[in-house]
């Protein structure tokens, strides 16, 4: 269970294809009226490790930040064709259920040929009292 807050899709030149989630995330954040600092859990698909590292570098997030892929990413869990988006959402939904103090989470992935897709989600279990 989650509530979709906003989403963004963007494309970059194929030569830098792994960077697509950066502009898609910027679009999603702008639509939501949020900043990267409002996001408490990041589920980033890592078909290639450099994709996640580039994303983290762009947004000044440490590569060992515990908010990033806390249950493991595609390198640890696998990267089956057409299953990544569902895996990201399921992992985030479970983390929301376990962490009611977390309000916003983000799923992002490179979707091929320079495209990036990002969705910002709100935790339906959120409670400021936690």
Regions found by a protein language model. Give the residues of each.
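Claisen-condensing/thiolase-fold acyl-transfer catalytic domains that form or cleave C-C bonds
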Residues: 1-130
